[in-house]
Structure formats: C-alpha cells, structure tokens
C-alpha cells in the first residue's frame, strides 16, 4: 500500500464531532459527488476507489441524516480494473446538500467554501481532511522529492482550498493542470504540518522518521564526498611535489638548493605519505607550521617549473658546486 493510501486509511479511523463530520462530508461530496435526476428524484453518487473511505462516507451520512443510503460496488473495465465504490442517496438529497452548504436555493451550487461553515479551527481542519480524502496525494518520503497536493476541478474552489491551507501558514501554492487545478506543498516541514492539521499522526511520524534518516544519509554523503575530495587534493599535491623534487634532484641536485629548501625536499621524498603537519615536526632545524611547510614546497614547485621551462640554475637562484 502506498504512503498516500496508508495516510488516508489512518484518517478514516478518526473519531470526530457531528459538526466536524458535516464539514468533512461537505468537502468530500463537493469534490467527489455527482448529481443526477430521475423521476423527479435528485440522486447523489459519491464515488471512490478506496473501500475504507467509502465506508467512512457511508457511516458519516448514516450517523448524521436519517435517510436511506446505498453502497454499491462496480468494477472498472479500463486500465486498472479496480473496484469503484459508490455511496448513493436517492431521497433527502437536496436538503442534505443545502445543509452541507454545497447547494443554495433554488438549485445553485456554491463555487467556493462557505466561510461561516469553516469558521472554527477544527472545522478548517475537517474540511482539509475531507478534501485530502477526496482527491489528495502525497509522495512517499523515501522518494527523491517531497510533494503533497489536492486536486480540484474548479479554479475558485481550488483557490479557496489554498487560502484555507495558508491560514495555517503552509505556504501552499496553486497550479493549473490539464483537467483542473491543484493546491500543493513542496517543503517537507510544511507537509508534516499539514499531516498534523488533518490528524494523520502516524503518517506524520513515519514521514519525519524517513526524512530524518534521509537527511542524515545526505549529510554523511556530503561529508564523505568532501573528505574524499580533500584527500584526493592532498594526494595529488604530494605526487606533484615529489615529482618536482625528483626532477630538481636529477637535473641540478638537491645540494644546489638553499638549506631550508634542501631539508624539506629530502624529507618529502623520504616520507611520501606523511602530512604537512608531520613534515613540519620532522625538521631538525626547528618545528615549522603547516603553512610554512606548504610555502617551502610551493617554492620547490616554482623552481622545478622554471628549470623545465629552460631557465638556468643561476637564473633560478641556485648555486651549482664545481667540485
């Protein structure tokens, strides 16, 4: 089962007050309900592919309204042949839709969210929970990117959902899609806040556990990469230094070098694997800092390069013994 499905399953087990149940129902029906007319009856079908959600919608309607409710199961014939669950109302439909602020007399559908209906903070949470159950999705936190969205067919309703989410400082944004509009979150912290708002505590804890482990792995990888890069840099520098010192040795001899350069040159080729700090501690003329050792080795690099370019030892500042 996907992370989104697990989250929705958790939400279907929540106990809510009657007032919050109405708001949750209103959001779900507003987004997943369909109205049809037959023999002067107003028929409402609420459709979902999630059995747990269908049971919740059925139970909420049954608890709130004393009307006959049908629960139908159909099988999709195209693509994924999943079951489709339909909660159907054939009587009292109009009154229920008006009570849920989805329909206004005489038969006008509301385009947005009734502000009075979501005045209380718990009602705001309930509406977002219903909207997420209806058409929400959230990426598994183990995937490469964080993403949570709620889809709506109507732009005005989508904008209202975005505004409702941002009353909780979620920094939600909207985007037009091919068949409608979405309100979405991209920041991990905001996604966990949203999960907390709608009451998905277990999903939130799982999301945070995975996110923390993922961030730790990323930090370790960055540290390892940085240390590897520094190690490679150190090794390359040591190889270059030894190569240059051996070139000086083979062309003019180390004896031509000034004493302070001659000593470090001899130590470097005799101790290829030691650090600059360790080289500084080996000097018989007195301990020298890491930066001081680095300065002397750079001077040896410069001498080798000048000799390679054709300059004479005298031009480089070296004294060649005639004996």
Curated annotation (Swiss-Prot):
Gene3D superfamilies: Homing endonucleases. Signal peptide: none annotated. Belongs to the WhiA family. It comes from the Bacteria. Involved in cell division and chromosome segregation. Keywords: Cell cycle, Cell division, DNA-binding. The keyword Transport does not apply. This is Probable cell division protein WhiA. The keyword Cell division applies. Residues 275-309 bind DNA. Transmembrane segments: none annotated. Pfam families: HTH_WhiA, LAGLIDADG_WhiA, WhiA_N. One of its GO terms (biological process) is cell division. HAMAP family: HTH_type_WhiA. GO terms for molecular function: DNA binding.
